[in-house]
């Protein structure tokens, strides 16, 4: 049975590989002409660069070894290298396409090492050897046995059937000692591993099966911190986001049919204090505000009879509402939690669509644009006007910082990433919040676009802006909010600092990602921060 499945999928695998094109073109964006182009932004789709003032996808170079050098079959092909069918008994085979049927340190075989050590890079796996596929990498079908078979396998669509740290498996790890630790991204689940991650059908057992699983629609049947499951966690702690209930875990939350051991589901509460009569918009739509597009997405099952919170998410420079709709982790966290999410197009400027966050990029009145959108959406959909939040990445992070300066009367809190207030805005007296404003900024120490320590930046030639720097931005917000004392380490180990003794009961935070670059921060953490606040 396994053989027939493997052979049937081989054809699909080879066909799809042969017909593959640039990944970004399938998303409507050009491919960078230079595969070594500078990485400006990274998301779930891949690495993004900029060419001709537009986003482009950076295509990874793929090795294409068409060598059919048969090597020395006699004496087993020791140190053979480059053989398409393999070394049937020798050591240090290297670069074989069909596998080493008994040698050590096989390396780079697409069909697998049937008994050798340190196989490496096999797409079908090691069917039996000692340490059969350690540090294998890039195996699509997995390791079907072996002691510690397939440790740190990585990127397997069907799974490691016994190894640790499988990584990216679509069907799961069906056993093994700590099978599939840090698996990640499996749609059917890790059947025994830790930190499964992103499984759609769940983890059905195992030692600490599926800890920090995340995003499973049917549930984690034994793991902790499952997260985002629609039908329930049947034994794990901190399940989260389940629609039908947690049948034994702690903090499961909010079931439609009752709490049988924990809480679950979208944790955001809808307000009954808002009159929703006549507000009929409750499904995904595009609005036109001042000639710009705004994409509005509604949570699954939204009925419009109770008022939901709204997250406004600003895109990076040269981005768009359409691009950022699929790129923001903060938006995904909010939508999964039951909030409405809006993605707005920035105004066209010298460097593409941008936001007016200082003496660069665009002269548009984005503050009034945001106000106009809020007025429109609250008249058409049942939005809680006291729980409207802002977030964004890069220049979108700058706009969500600036929202606190100019929109604190309509925006309840913000969670910006990878941008500071411009010194010109602060020194020019343009940041005067109407009230104490809660804000949590995310910044990477290795950001090469908006430097962590701040300084002069020429985003647009001839129109420089001066970033305050992460720490100074943090202190400036604390000062404007009347915070006293020293910031606390909010959660040990996550390198987040938080001022909690501030006017109006607000908080001011900074999460520093050591070694982090120019990227969006922890989306769930950002959303969890803002949603605790509402307008007075």
UniProtKB/Swiss-Prot annotation:
Record region (12 X 13 AA repeats of N-Q-G-G-G-M-[PQ]-W-G-D-F-G-G): 78-249
Gene behind the chain: ESTA
Protein's UniProt keywords contain Oxidoreductase: no
Region described as Catalytic: 257-536
Subcellular location: Secreted
Biased composition (Gly residues): 203-252
GO cellular component: extracellular region
GO-annotated molecular function: feruloyl esterase activity
Regulation: Inhibited by the specific serine esterase inhibitor AEBSF.
PANTHER family: FERULOYL ESTERASE C-RELATED, PTHR38050
Function: Involved in degradation of plant cell walls. Hydrolyzes of the feruloyl-arabinose ester bond in arabinoxylans as well as the feruloyl-galactose and feruloyl-arabinose ester bonds in pectin.
Pfam families per UniProt: CBM_10
Ranges of the Sequence repeats in the UniProt entry: 78-90, 91-103, 104-116, 117-129, 134-146, 151-163, 164-176, 181-193, 194-206, 211-223, 224-236, 237-249
Catalytic activity: feruloyl-polysaccharide + H2O = ferulate + polysaccharide
GO BP annotations, alphabetical order: cell wall macromolecule catabolic process; pectin catabolic process; xylan catabolic process
Enzyme Commission number: 3.1.1.73
Lineage: Eukaryota, Fungi, Fungi incertae sedis, Chytridiomycota, Chytridiomycota incertae sedis
Glycan-modified residues: 65
Subunit structure: Component of the multienzyme cellulase-hemicellulase complex.
Region (Cellulose-binding): 22-59
Domain spans labelled CBM10: 21-59
Protein name: Feruloyl esterase B
Region (Disordered): 203-273
